[in-house]
């Protein structure tokens, strides 16, 4: 379909511009989600009816500053590992706000994190915290650690970062921050 190809080419062009614009390292959540939506559209064209997605983030969060390319690696991992089962696969991006914090949740309908995967991520993150600088990790598996480290640098100690499984055993990764406190929450679900 010509319209689909045309829209995908436009999205790819905008994605490339977003990625290569090094003048901006901080964007609004609105800009980041717009980029993620374009990425998901391209993945939908690739996987067609096997992939569904939804983005439902509270309007009041859209002007929050975030590091550029902070959500896309989470979504990319959700597609990569969430498709380890029979389609259709669904990626959901949602938000939660309470009186002292907000968070963005990326969930998939895949098989979830294995205990071994959760232990590895936890070990890699703890290693990166203890040994600041470039983590000594293989290229494969840097996505979650990279997101954690960049989010921690950006937010200082006001960080929410969770990964694990939902009540129905699907994968979930959450990032967020506290409004007024110096609390830090790093949790393996």
Enumerate the language-model features and the residues they cover:
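Two-component histidine phosphotransfer core
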Residues: 1-164
């Amino acid at each position: 379909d010509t319209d689909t190809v045309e829209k995908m080419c436009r999205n790819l062009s905008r994605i490339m511009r977003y990625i290569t614009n090094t003048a901006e390292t901080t964007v609004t959540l609105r800009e980041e989600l717009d980029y993620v939506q374009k990425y998901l559209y391209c993945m939908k064209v690739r996987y067609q009816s096997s992939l569904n997605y939804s983005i439902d983030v509270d309007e009041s969060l859209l002007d929050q500053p975030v590091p550029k390319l902070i959500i896309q690696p989470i979504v990319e991992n959700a597609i990569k590992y969430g498709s380890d089962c029979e389609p259709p696969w669904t990626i959901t991006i949602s938000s939660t706000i309470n009186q002292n914090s907000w968070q963005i949740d990326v969930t998939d309908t895949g098989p979830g994190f294995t205990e071994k995967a959760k232990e590895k991520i936890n070990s890699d993150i703890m290693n990166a915290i203890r040994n600041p600088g470039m983590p000594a990790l293989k290229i494969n598996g840097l996505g979650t650690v990279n997101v954690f480290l960049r989010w921690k640098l950006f937010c200082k100690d006001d960080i929410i970062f969770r990964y694990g499984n939902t009540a129905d055993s699907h994968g979930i990764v959450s990032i967020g921050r506290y409004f007024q406190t110096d609390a830090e929450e790093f949790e393996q679900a």
